[in-house]
Regions:
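Canonical Rossmann dinucleotide-binding motif of NAD(H)/NADP(H)-dependent dehydrogenases/reductases
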Residues: 2-34
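Substrate-binding pocket helix/loop in short-chain dehydrogenase/reductase
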Residues: 98-99, 103-111, 232
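Active-site helix of classical SDR
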Residues: 122, 168, 176
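Alpha-helical segment proximal to the catalytic Tyr-Lys
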Residues: 127, 181-182, 260
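Short, small/polar-rich loop/turn modules that mediate ligand/substrate recognition or access, typified
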Residues: 184, 189, 262-264
Length: 275
């Protein structure tokens, strides 16, 4: 038996990278999962591969910044699996600049994906969360539920050149603490995981060619210069950047029954940097 048998999870931004690793881990522990990606081909392929491995997974394609998406996402869990127990707000990307070079478009793009989208997903889930909790309490069978919001060490300490990203991630930490107070009565824990340097396609790039991703028609430069990576990694006490599996492990810890009395916290997953 898995630690999450019978649970149903939503994981946004989960076709690749940390999100994909989260889906794999939750499914391996018995959860049924609705995964999400902006790219239909990526989402469908990920879902097919996971189902082939024995997971119960469905895909919900769409942009988390679309105001209509959160309702579809929550409904996908209820229609496919009949319940909702875990919400992981993972979708995001970096679009970095110093303040004097940051346009309004760039600023709002970072707030939309890192703060507004999680807010809307959680708001869309609130009717189900509250009604289910009340019914379970009345029946004498309370059920713990979990929300994990993906943040960053940049949202805790700030980071030069990431004015919009850091603001969005700081905001999600504030929302986490507030919702922990609002939803505690419904037996829901709400926590954030603040990542440090995790190697994904968003942080890696070819030495001679900056990487880009297409976000709703915008070509966004991503990646960390390999020379900078080489300088950063020795400063991490564990001596290396994290992996998607490392990130998934931190999120998983906040989804299991052993963390039922932990709420309103920001867990840093940074390999010890900074201490």
């Amino acid at each position: 038996m898995g630690t999450l048998d019978g649970k149903v999870a939503l994981v946004s931004g989960s076709g690749r990278g940390i999100g994909r690793a989260v889906v794999e881990k939750l499914a391996a522990e018995g959860a049924r999962v609705v995964l999400n990606d902006l790219d239909k081909d990526v989402a469908d392929e990920a879902a097919a591969q996971l189902r082939q491995a024995g997971a119960e997974v469905v895909a919900c394609v769409g942009s988390v910044t679309d105001p209509e998406f959160p309702g579809r996402f929550v409904q996908a869990a209820l229609d496919s699996f009949g319940r909702l127990d875990i919400i992981v707000n993972n979708a995001g990307y970096t679009w970095d600049n110093v303040i004097q070079k940051t346009s309004d478009e760039q600023w709002y793009a970072m707030l939309d994906v890192h703060l507004t989208a999680p807010f809307r997903i959680l708001r869309a889930s609130s009717d189900y969360i509250r009604s289910a909790a009340k019914a379970e309490a009345a029946a004498g069978t309370p059920v713990m539920r979990k929300v994990v919001n993906v943040s960053s060490v940049s949202g805790v300490l700030g980071n030069a050149g990431q004015i919009g990203y850091a603001a969005g991630k700081a905001g999600i930490n504030g929302m986490t603490k507030t919702l922990a107070k609002e939803w505690g009565r419904y037996q829901v824990t709400v926590n954030s995981v603040g990542f440090g340097l995790i190697k994904t396609r968003l942080t890696e790039m070819v030495a001679d060619a900056p990487g880009t991703i297409d976000i709703e028609g915008r070509q966004i430069r991503v990646g960390v210069n390999p020379e900078l990576l080489a300088a950063i990694e020795p400063s991490i006490p564990l001596g290396r950047a994290g992996t998607p599996r490392d990130g998934a492990g931190a999120i998983y810890l906040l989804c299991i029954p052993e963390s039922d009395y932990i709420t309103g916290q920001v867990l840093l997953c940074t390999g010890g940097a900074p201490i």
